[in-house]
Amino acid sequence: MIDIDRPKLEGSVAVGEGRRIGFAEFGSATGRAVFWLHGTPGARRQIPLEARTYAERNDIRIIGLDRPGVGSSTPYSYPNVLSFADDLATVADTLGIDRFAVIGLSGGGPYALAVARAMPERVVVTGILGGVAPTMGPDAIDGGAMVLGKFLAPMLPVIGAPIGRVLSSFVRVARPIAEPAIAIYGRLSPAADRELLQRPEFKAMFLDDLLNGGRKQMEAPFADVVVFARDWGFAVGDITGPVRWWHGDRDHIIPHTHGEHMVHLLPDAKLFTMAGESHLGGLGMAVDIITELMAVWDQEQPLIPR
């Protein structure tokens, strides 16, 4: 296992109603800001080491955010996906960030789109990596993991918390065997994801993220599923800013057709198909993804310094 540096800055921000949202910063403290929204499950450190190094060298400030119940974030149930945007806005204000890009991986995708919808004047560009699509309403599409999620969603407000507590307890007890557990998950994954999880730097990142995700981290994914299965609170087609979407054509969790569907709905979007890649493919292309988003930033806001 390789060594992994701590974030440049790590803490939490008060977002109202007695709640806090945890964050971790990587890269340059004065560079262009990129909010990175983790997958389901995940936490604030679920950011590839290559992306952190690239950000440091290219004057980019990456901020990973915990969702409610993860890390130092207060447990909370959003009424819909759009409600998350208020919390991110408060974090951005507190950290002195005006304009920014936002990246959402998998379950972070809906929240990234919500931020783009709620703050078009602040979000310069949005990147989605294998993002979840709506399951109800005019923007809905069937298939993938959310078929089961939609079925379970009505029960999760009751059973999700106790199941999550058991799983979180297992994570704490299993710290000495966390690395073998990640290896086992990799062996059960499709070839592309398995190869990524065998790379020492990604194994180290996932292990670090898992062990710093807090004592309730396994309850939070159930809250994600519940809110994903509802009306999101906005129409995908109302997002006016540029969106760049990366999706593996062998994604076994969120099918590639979901990416095609979402890009068709978005007014200003481009789909990058990752040939031969599965659900985690975007993590292995993090530098290319950030480079693309910064190029769009240059086109959209050429006078804003890095």
Language model feature labels by segment:
Residues 147-234:
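Alpha/beta-hydrolase
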Residues 268-306:
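Catalytic active-site module of serine/aspartate enzymes centered on a nucleophile-bearing elbow/loop
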Residues 239, 245-247, 251:
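Short beta-strand/loop motif that positions the catalytic acidic residue
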Residues 219, 249-254:
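Acidic catalytic loop of the alpha/beta-hydrolase fold
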Residues 99-143:
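Conserved hydrolase catalytic core segment
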Residues 83-101:
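Conserved acidic catalytic loop of the alpha/beta-hydrolase fold
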Residues 19-72:
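Conserved HGGG/HGGXW glycine-rich cap/lid loop of the alpha/beta-hydrolase fold
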